[in-house]
C-alpha cells in the first residue's frame, strides 16, 4: 500500500518567519519551485499555515523531525551561537546522539547522528 514518504510538513502561524529560521538559522536551501519547501536529502520538507486552510494551529510535540548532522555537539554549539535554545544536553542512546530544540512556532526538532549501525 504505502511505498514511500512523499513529504513532511510542519505547521506555522507565520510561514515567512519560519522560512527565515529554516534558511538563515538551520541553513536549509529552499526549493526553487516552492517558496516554503526544502529538499533535505531525498525528502521534501515544507512549511504550511493551517489557518489558511481552515484548520486550527497546533505545534507538533513528541513527533520530532530528526535532522541529520555529522556532529551533534558541534552543530548544537553553532545553533546556540545563533540564539537557538536547546532542551537539555546532547543525549547518547548507545546507537545515536540527539539534541532537542524547537522552531519559532514551538514544533519539536532534533539534531541526530547515528554512530552505530542498526541491528536486525
Regions found by a protein language model. Give the residues of each.
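N-terminal beta-strand motif that seeds the catalytic metal site of vicinal oxygen chelate
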Residues: 1-17, 63-65, 115-120
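Conserved short beta-strand elements that form part of the metal-binding/catalytic scaffold
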Residues: 29-60, 108-114
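Short amphipathic alpha-helices within nucleic acid-binding modules
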Residues: 21, 73-78
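Amphipathic alpha-helical segments
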Residues: 14-28
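Helix N-cap motif at beta-to-alpha junctions
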Residues: 14-15, 70-72
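Vicinal oxygen chelate
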Residues: 76, 80-120
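Short secondary-structure junctions
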Residues: 26-33, 86-90
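Short hydrophobic/aromatic beta-strand element in the GNAT-like acyltransferase core
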Residues: 37, 66, 98-100
Amino acid at each position: 500500500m504505502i511505498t514511500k514518504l512523499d513529504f513532511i510538513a510542519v505547521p506555522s502561524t507565520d510561514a515567512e518567519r519560519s522560512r527565515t529560521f529554516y534558511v538563515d538559522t538551520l541553513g536549509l536551501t529552499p526549493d526553487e519551485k516552492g517558496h516554503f519547501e526544502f529538499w533535505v536529502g531525498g525528502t521534501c520538507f515544507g512549511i504550511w499555515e493551517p489557518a489558511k486552510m481552515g484548520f486550527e494551529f497546533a505545534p507538533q510535540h513528541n513527533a520530532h523531525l530528526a535532522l541529520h548532522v555529522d556532529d551533534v555537539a558541534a552543530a548544537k554549539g553553532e545553533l546556540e551561537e545563533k540564539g537557538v535554545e536547546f532542551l537539555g544536553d546532547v543525549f547518547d542512546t548507545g546507537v545515536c546522539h540527539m539534541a532537542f530544540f524547537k522552531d519559532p512556532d514551538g514544533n519539536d526538532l532534533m539534531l541526530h547522528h547515528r554512530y552505530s549501525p542498526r541491528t536486525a
